[in-house]
Regions:
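N-terminal subdomain of nucleotide-sugar transferases
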Residues: 1-73
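Donor nucleotide-sugar binding/catalytic pocket of nucleotide-sugar-dependent glycosyltransferases
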Residues: 162, 177-221
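Conserved donor-binding/catalytic core segment of Leloir-type glycosyltransferases
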Residues: 231-248, 254-257
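Nucleotide-activated donor-binding/catalytic signature segment of Leloir-type glycosyltransferases, i.e.
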Residues: 281-302
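Short alpha-helical donor nucleotide-sugar binding micro-motif in glycosyltransferases
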Residues: 310-315
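Aromatic "clamp/platform" in nucleotide-sugar-dependent glycosyltransferases that forms part
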Residues: 323
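Short hydrophobic beta-strand element within catalytic cores of glycosyltransferases
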Residues: 340-343
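Conserved acidic donor-binding segment of nucleotide-sugar-dependent glycosyltransferases
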Residues: 355-369, 378-383
């Protein structure tokens, strides 16, 4: 149930321009507005709405010449797109044609058109600014803007900490000391930030990324398999996300899958991969070279929630072999659909599966294909055990990641720092 909003938050996602990230996954701005769901930002929008907080998304883009407003249809949120400044365009062009040190960092700082942003923040009646990442140039300039406009500035952690350039290092420390608060889901990252930047603990809040567990629920398994043309007696491990081989540990997953199939000859085993990305061509080559059994790959970005639920509902176990994450939503989607999870201990996973098997999953060391194979094999070999873990996973999703639970926590933290 939504509450009448009495607070408005400006949400600024990571990336210099809208097209920098979305072009790499084949998502046009029209598709973004009409169809895209599932990412952390939409979870925040939905969760905050349940707590009476309205969210306005802000992007910069080279595809508009004046501030333009749109509606994100699935959430109803306003999307305000600001034109990139001429100076940023010039620096961006130069970066493509030279290797001048520090120019890329300068471009990142210039990517946020502060004058236009200030005007649109006032127009929307925004009470606070929330940036996707605090170790990024946009956060630094937003803290400055917040001081000038007397607006509190917060930031989340979604996995994007970067190496500091000579320009960024002093700016970052100053911005973190002067921001209002940080929202971090993982205890490991909280400890790192406290150690590296010396921030007072009260400035940090441990709040998980939310998920609409009412919408993310399992379909009938047999019907899902029928739609996908998968035999009812096949055993399926599923993964979905961006195809980035090293970061997402897909090389580890392929090696683990090879072990699993070799140890279980004669069984109909399927590895269902859903997603695309910058390493798609390389992954195709690896799969062909390794001559792996039963790999089914939907090489596209799937933004249809019903279709994604169908893929998850057809599976027996979900796996996340990542080497690095921020706080991944994908395994929570699988848990909400009643799937047990086998995941590498990347940041966020020890928090999501805090109770281990009691939370509905198994955690293995990162980069360890043998350990991943053993854990996945254990789940695939034990039907009763896998069903029990799936029930626990669903309970964990409902109790810890629902919109209502997270929305209340977010509102309390944002309001506790209002002046």
């Amino acid at each position: 149930m939504n509450v009448q909003p009495d607070l408005t938050i400006a949400l600024l996602p990571w990336g210099d321009l809208f097209e920098d990230f979305h072009d790499t996954i084949g998502v046009s701005f029209e598709t973004f507005c009409k169809e895209l769901t599932g990412s952390w930002q939409f979870g925040y929008i939905d969760a905050l709405r349940t707590a009476g907080v309205r969210t306005v998304l802000f992007f910069a883009s080279e595809h508009v010449s004046t501030p333009s407003r749109f509606t994100h249809v699935p959430t109803g949120a306003t999307v305000c797109v600001l034109p990139a400044s001429p100076l940023h365009r010039a620096v961006r062009y130069t970066v493509k044609h030279t290797s001048f040190p520090g120019l890329k960092t300068l471009g990142a700082y210039l990517s946020t058109p502060l004058g236009l942003l200030a005007r649109e923040l006032r127009r929307e009646g925004c009470n606070a600014i929330l940036c996707q990442e605090y170790e990024y140039a946009r956060f630094d300039v937003c803290v400055l803007l917040g001081k000038l406009m007397r607006l509190p500035v917060f930031a989340t952690f979604q996995g994007g900490h970067q190496q500091l350039s000579r320009i960024e290092a002093p700016m970052r420390s100053l911005a973190l000391q002067n921001c209002t608060g940080l929202i971090i889901a993982t205890q490991t990252e909280i400890d790192r930030v406290l150690t590296d930047y010396g921030l007072p603990p009260a400035k940090l809040a441990r709040i998980f990324n939310p998920l609409d567990v009412k919408l993310w629920c399992a379909l009938d398994r047999d019907e899902a398999r029928g739609q996908l043309g998968i035999p009812l007696d096949a055993q399926i491990a599923v993964w979905h996300g961006r195809i980035e081989i090293n970061r997402k540990g897909l090389d580890v997953l392929l090696e683990a899958w090879k072990h699993i199939c070799c140890e279980r000859p004669g069984r109909d085993l399927r590895l269902l991969l859903v997603g695309t990305g910058s390493d798609a061509d390389e992954l195709h080559q690896r799969i062909a070279t390794m001559q792996l059994q039963g790999v089914m790959w939907v090489d596209e970005f799937v933004n249809d929630r019903t279709k994604m639920r169908c893929y998850l509902s057809a599976a027996d176990v979900y796996t996340l072999p990542s080497r690095h994450e921020g706080f991944p939503v994908a395994p929570i989607e699988a848990m909400a659909c009643g799937l047990p999870v086998v995941a590498a201990d990347a940041p966020g996973i020890p928090d999501i599966l805090e109770g281990g098997e009691a939370s509905g999953g198994l955690v293995v060391p990162r980069g360890d294909a043998k350990a991943l194979a053993l854990a996945l094999g254990r789940i695939l070999d034990d039907e009763a055990g896998r069903h029990e873990l799936g029930k626990r996973a669903r309970c964990r999703a409902e109790d810890s990641f629902s919109l209502q639970v997270i929305g209340k926590q977010l509102r309390e933290f944002l309001l506790s720092h209002q002046t």
